[in-house]
């Protein structure tokens, strides 16, 4: 039994039977391997949009974006695993959501709602289920949620627009 595990589905304990990517799971090093999908949500005019799962891995921003000029960014990192019975689980993503919310507050960034954080992470993992290593391989799917000031800012002040993204890599 995985204690404090979070199953990657909205209802029930769905077992993923999707065929895994053909990788040498036992010999993967820690590095970036582009997966198929990622989550993107934008903050503008005081509100976060619903966000989308997309195949587009490109981030396009102004040379004067808050993240580039004043390093207004924060991130988290967590992992997804396949259990012996075929479930895909993450360990306590709610705690990552809380830490990211705390980081955002410290940086005068809008908090991405914690429940939406968990939903976005789970949706991204589910969209990349074929990239979650098989049980017993010793590998995991690394999940990187991050947020940054995306609009042009000159002068020391917080940005007014932000982007929250989640990508995965085995």
Feature locations, PLM:
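Conserved alpha/beta cores of soluble small-molecule-handling proteins
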Residues: 2-170
